[in-house]
Amino acid sequence: RTTLHRLNFRDVSALVEHARAMALDGISFLAADTVTSAFGRSAAGGAHADLALAPCDVAEFAEVIEALLATHADDVQSGFILESPARLRRLPQYYAALAGLDAYPEVACNAPEVSIVIEADGTVRPCFFHAPIGSLRQAPLQRLVHEQLTAFRRTWNPDTDVICGRCVCSLRTSWRSAPWH
């Protein structure tokens, strides 16, 4: 996945061309998560907060996405660009919401129902963006899944969850159509 942010959003078309030149099977895009503690960082700001688009860049990003859809329509149609036009258009809307200019895009996600995240240090999360439910250094995975993950899933409601409402990654899948197939 390619994370689009303040420093590279204008280069999205060039990123597609680079992916082709590298003979990759495809390319996928995601907005930068600047608000959670995902990926081993503090949620209290820091360097990752600087990745958000400035309010004055949001309209330009929307234009960049529309240009991408026009110039790379074949790549979208063939699936080389993995996102649909609607999902690509969510990217500038996400940054608009982050800047207080719009509502966050609707999220339809079930990642915590079909996957878990195990970080390099053994931390286990229900998805990349939610708080840890435990650590492999303190409990075996089977116990974490059967106890802590089950407890998380019982109380989790993606329609009202604050983390889900501001999530950059709206994953809706099933075991039969999982992204790794």
Map each language-model feature to its residues:
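A general structural signal for well-ordered secondary-structure junctions
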Residues: D25, D74, S115, T150-A151
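Radical SAM enzyme [4Fe-4S]-AdoMet core and its adjacent flexible, acidic
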Residues: R1-N110, A120, A131
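Flexible mid-to-C-terminal extensions adjoining Fe-S/redox cofactors in radical SAM and related proteins
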Residues: A103-N110, V117, D121-H181
